[in-house]
Amino acid sequence: MIDCLSEVYSSHENIWGPFDIDLERGFFNEETVGEFIDAYFEHTVRPRSRIVLKSLFNLETTSAHLLLTIFLLGANFGPSEGAKSQATRRLDMAEYAVFENPTFLQLVYNQQPRTSDSLNQTEIESIQAAVLIILIQLASPKADARRRVRIQRYPALVSVARATSLTQVRNRWHDPTVPLNHANFLKNETCIRLMASITMLDCHNIMFLNTPPQFTVTEFGFDLPAEEKGIDLGDSATWEIWAQNEREYQRPSPLNRFIQELLSDDWPGLEDPKYSNLNVFTLFVVVSGKHPTPQFLASMLK
C-alpha cells in the first residue's frame, strides 16, 4: 500500500507536500491493517451490497490498490477520530493511485471489445478499488476532489463498464439447464454487484449533483444481485444447497426488462414468485436504473 502512494507521489510531487516514508509506515502497520479492514467489513457495508465478499477476501493475494481503498474506507468510518483524520489526508493520493494504476488504464483505453467473462481477478479488483474510492471521495470536504470524481473519475469508470460489457453481465446459476459452478457464480455475482453499484452512483450524481445520466436504461442488461438470505456465498457446500433451493423459483429479468415489466399494465406485483426474493438493495438498483429525479421520487412517495 505504501508503494502505491509512493509511486503516485513521485509522479505528482507538485500536488502534495513531502512524502514521509516513516510516517506512512507508522500508519500502515500490522495492527492498523487488521483493525481497519475489519472495520470495513463490519461497519461500512451491508452484506447484500458488498462488492468484496468477506469470506473470499485474502490479505495475502488481494491487489495493493484494492487493499488500500478498503483500508482507508475502514479507517474513515472507524471509531478513531485520529485514524479518520490520517486516512482523509491520504485519500487524494489513493484516488490518483487507483485511477492511474496501469491495469485500470488498460481497461479505460482498451480498443478491443471484451466481455466480463474475460476479466481476470486483478482487473476485477482494479474496478472494485475504483468504485470504493469514488464512494469515499463523493463525501470529501474538498470541493476539488468531489468535482474531479464527478467530471473525470466516474466517467472513466463508466467507460470501463461499457468496454468490458459489465452492463450485460448475467449469472445463469438459477437455470436448471446450466451445471452449477461455484467459481463462475462468484465471478459473475461480483461483476453484477459492481455494475449495480455503478448504476447507483449514476443515480446519486443525477439526483444530488444535477448531472445528466451516463447510461441509458436500455443499456442495463445485467442481472440483479442474488438474494443470499444470510448464507456465506463463499462456502461452496452451503452455496450449492442454497442454489439448488433457489432453482425452484424464477429469477427476475435483467434490469432493463425488469423496469419495463414494472411499468407495464401487466405487472403482477411482488406476490409473483419471480419477484419474491427482492431485497432493499435490489429495489434501490431498480429505482436507480430508472434514472430518477427528485421530482420522480417525490411522485412515488405520494
Please place each PLM-identified region on the residue numbering.
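Intrinsically disordered, low-complexity activation-like regions
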Residues: M1-S63, T69, L73, M93-N110, ...
